[in-house]
């Protein structure tokens, strides 16, 4: 089946009632105003019986009641530096949060941010950690949608030179990254006695390079004592060339969202003409068909005259000086941000650059920045995009891979991910054989009822959205999930959708949901 408009492949929801508000289909009409008596609450982690506290781990223990600015007990966690030797010559910083979920006793989940050179503490503090301090908020708050409610999670700054991990970097390509990471991971497993645990690797953005290469190296070890890999998830990932991920989809995406961009008709005519002339639209029309075409089209070259993404972004700044390509619906003023990312307005300080924060995390005085100015790859990343290399093999060997993408990301585009998938061959076939249009449903929860009646939920961020939030399509061990209202960081913008998605990966089945998307209480 051919779909001539690239965006159209995800606009089709495939239901007879598509004109009905999809967010209300599963909601019965209210009868009377009633209070919600029973409510789920965020996990309160106040036990002194720390499961992972041993003589080996005591030096990493973080006092969960003394984290600066955090006025609640974060519970058991461990942070510090472990060596990445023998393949590396430095150490990597980690912050490990055990879960109170009894179903998580035999697994460990790894979270990696991208960059290259961006700290995974960004993911912890503003996306899926047990406490959040997101842009525009006054102070840290508990995160009812923390992934630690589902599983044990470790956030790692890697490669060396990223975040709290001391440099200089000595990696030249993704094979070096994987070798140094897996050397570090063996030290981590030995320290916390995690031998034989099921391992899941997750991340976003440039982690679309990191995760498949690390996963491939783990599987190649054939050593389930340390590398019992069971699945991966990569969101808004860098998995192909810039031509496919950024430039070919840029103008089609602008057209779809120009009610937000509000660029004038003269510019639209000019930039659409350039996209046609450069071959971007023709490439998408051929690439995003189901099943994929044979032969598959070659992505256009990015010449000096074909840098359409750059021109769109420059024009967007003229209309909206606070345009944020990580989340294209941001407007002025910038939200102040303790990290300065992904909101572009810096706050009064850099939280992780504070000496009291660094002391409690057991790191030496460090000039921390969320995305390091240190060069990670001195001569550029020498590896091919992961979709050309290890990603298809990882899909085949785990049969449990999720690629997620937010529609409101204007840096790496969902149609870039789709075009990439259609050019990959795994488990005997190339690409998806049918369009990825099945709706992703996230269950409703009590907090939304409080909002309906005008009550103030407690805590407010409990009220992540519910209903039909995107699409989720699975073929031959690969799931592609799109999220309508998310930018580059899905756990930050639409936590319920990402929690549902990751919950499915943990049981090696793509079923929505498994452990739930409402706040969990295992106490």
Curated annotation (Swiss-Prot):
It holds the Pfam family Peptidase_S10. GO terms for biological process: proteolysis. Residues 19-52 form a propeptide. Residues 1-18 form the signal peptide. It comes from the Eukaryota. Coiled coil: none annotated. Changing residue 409 to A: Impairs catalytic activity. GO terms for molecular function: serine-type carboxypeptidase activity. Glycans are attached at residues 55, 63, 89, 149, 264, 353, 399, 415, 423. Keywords: Carboxypeptidase, Glycoprotein, Hydrolase, Protease, Signal, Zymogen. Its EC number is 3.4.16.-. Removes acidic, neutral and basic amino acids as well as proline from the C-terminal position at pH 2-5. Belongs to the peptidase S10 family. This is Carboxypeptidase cpdS. The gene is cpdS.
């Amino acid at each position: 089946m051919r779909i001539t408009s690239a965006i159209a492949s995800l606009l089709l929801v495939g239901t007879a009632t598509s004109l009905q508000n999809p967010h209300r289909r599963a909601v019965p009409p209210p009868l009377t105003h009633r209070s919600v008596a029973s409510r789920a609450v965020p996990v309160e982690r106040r036990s002194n019986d720390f499961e992972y506290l041993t003589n080996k781990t005591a030096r990493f223990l973080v006092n969960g009641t003394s984290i600066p600015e955090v006025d609640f007990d974060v519970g058991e966690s461990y942070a510090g530096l472990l060596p990445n030797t023998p393949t590396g010559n430095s150490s990597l910083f980690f912050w490990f949060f055990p879960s109170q979920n009894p179903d998580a006793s035999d697994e460990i989940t790894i979270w990696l941010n991208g960059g290259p050179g961006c700290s995974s503490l960004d993911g912890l503090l503003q996306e899926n950690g047990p406490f959040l301090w997101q842009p525009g908020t006054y102070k840290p708050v508990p995160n009812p949608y923390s992934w630690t409610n589902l599983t044990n999670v470790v956030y790692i700054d890697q490669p060396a030179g990223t975040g709290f991990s001391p440099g200089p970097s000595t990696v030249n390509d993704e094979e070096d990254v994987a070798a140094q990471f897996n050397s570090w991971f063996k030290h981590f497993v030995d320290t916390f006695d995690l031998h034989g645990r099921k391992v899941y690797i997750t991340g976003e953005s440039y982690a679309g390079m990191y995760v498949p290469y690390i996963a491939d190296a783990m599987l190649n070890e054939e050593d389930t004592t340390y590398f019992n890999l069971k699945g991966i998830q990569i969101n808004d990932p860098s998995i192909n060339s810039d031509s496919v991920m950024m430039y070919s989809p840029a103008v089609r995406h602008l057209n779809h969202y120009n009610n937000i961009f509000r660029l004038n008709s003269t510019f639209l005519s000019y930039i659409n003409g350039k996209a046609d002339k450069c071959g971007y639209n023709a490439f998408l029309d051929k690439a995003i068909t189901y099943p994929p075409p044979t032969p598959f089209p070659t992505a256009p070259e990015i010449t000096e005259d074909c840098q359409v993404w750059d021109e769109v972004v420059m024009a967007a700044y003229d209309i909206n000086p606070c345009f944020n390509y990580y989340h294209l619906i941001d407007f002025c003023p910038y939200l102040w941000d303790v990290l300065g990312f992904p909101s572009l307005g810096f706050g009064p300080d850099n939280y992780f650059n504070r000496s009291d924060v660094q002391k409690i995390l057991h790191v030496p005085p460090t000039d921390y920045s969320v995305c390091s100015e240190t060069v990670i790859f001195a001569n550029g990343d020498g590896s091919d995009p992961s979709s050309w290399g290890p990603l298809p093999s990882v899909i085949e060997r785990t049969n449990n891979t999720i690629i997620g993408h937010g529609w409101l990301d204007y840096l790496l585009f969902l149609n870039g991910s789709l075009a990439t998938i259609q050019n990959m061959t795994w488990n005997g076939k190339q690409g998806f054989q049918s369009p990825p249009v099945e709706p992703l449903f996230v269950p409703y929860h009590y907090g939304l009822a409080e909002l309906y009646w005008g009550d103030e939920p407690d805590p407010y961020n409990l009220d992540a959205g519910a209903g039909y939030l995107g699409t989720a399509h699975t073929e031959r061990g690969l799931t592609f999930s799109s999220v309508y209202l998310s930018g580059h960081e899905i756990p930050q913008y639409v936590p319920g959708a990402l929690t549902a998605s990751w919950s499915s990966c943990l049981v090696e089945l793509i079923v929505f949901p498994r452990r739930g998307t409402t706040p969990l209480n295992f106490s």
